[in-house]
A protein has these predicted regions:
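Active-site-adjacent betaalpha module
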Residues: 2-18, 54, 66-203
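A short alpha/beta connector and helix-capping loop motif
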Residues: 15-17, 33-59
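Catalytic-site beta-strand/loop segments enriched in glycine and acidic/polar residues
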Residues: 17, 22-25
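Short beta-strand segments at enzyme active-site cores
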Residues: 21-22, 57-63
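Short, flexible segments with low predicted structural confidence
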Residues: 22, 46-47, 130-132
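Short acidic, Gly/Ser-rich segments with clustered Asp/Glu that frequently serve as metal-coordination loops
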Residues: 26-31
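Short, solvent-exposed loop/turn segments at secondary-structure boundaries
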Residues: 32-35, 63, 151
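A short linear-motif detector with a strong N-terminal bias
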Residues: 37-38, 63-64, 145
Length: 203
């Protein structure tokens, strides 16, 4: 019988989640070879867009932007004036950067929705750190990529074995929206579902 006190049985909402996106930078994308770069990139963009529509707090982290490029503007422009935390400690784990971790902690949200580049490194290590801190981690898998298909596959498997819950863009947005009575439903359909659906061939 399911433990009804288990937070994992509670759906993601715009009130219990924080979205963390790690290292969506130009040089990182160049090395992605585990899937369609355009779809991976836009899954992250549309997750950020949905968060901006629904008011879900978002934390952005980058590594060595002078060499690897700035965080992609398609996401940063959704959050004007918000700082991208360029890690002062060049760690693969974004939460080893105190400012990044404090930004997440201060939201008070227990459900960590996270994705990043690359899957097996910065995404995985940060997600595992979130678990160690007592958060429930939800890995946005279709917004992640790695240098090879195997690197992505086994990075995902490592996270799942540790307790990260896999999720896709469409399931994430649907959970956040909850039902068609949501006053933001029309905007989500126009700005997220329809555009992403057309990109992946649903329309």
């Amino acid at each position: 019988m399911a433990n009804l006190a288990d937070g994992k049985l509670e759906l993601l909402t715009d009130r219990n989640s924080v979205l963390v996106l790690v290292d969506y930078q130009s040089a990182m994308f160049k090395s992605v070879a585990s899937g369609d770069k355009t779809i991976i990139k836009h899954a992250a963009i549309f997750a950020a867009k949905a968060a901006s529509i629904l008011g879900v707090p978002v934390v952005l982290s980058s590594i060595n932007p002078k060499s690897l490029g700035e965080f992609i503007p398609e996401i940063t422009r959704l959050f004007p004036g918000q700082e991208v935390f360029a890690r002062t400690m060049p760690s693969f784990d974004a939460f080893e950067d105190e400012r990044t971790w404090n930004a997440v902690r201060k939201t008070g949200r227990k459900k960590l929705v996270i994705s990043g580049l690359w899957t097996s490194m910065c995404f995985a290590y940060t997600a595992l750190h979130g678990l160690k801190e007592g958060l429930e981690a939800y890995g946005l898998i279709d917004a992640a990529g790695d240098s090879t298909p195997d690197a992505h596959k086994y990075g995902v498997e490592r996270m799942l074995q540790a307790g990260v819950i896999p999720i896709t863009l469409e399931s994430l947005v649907s959970e956040w929206m909850h039902d068609w009575g949501n006053p933001k439903a029309g905007e989500l359909v126009k700005e997220v579902y329809s555009k992403y659906g057309a990109m992946i061939g649903l329309q």
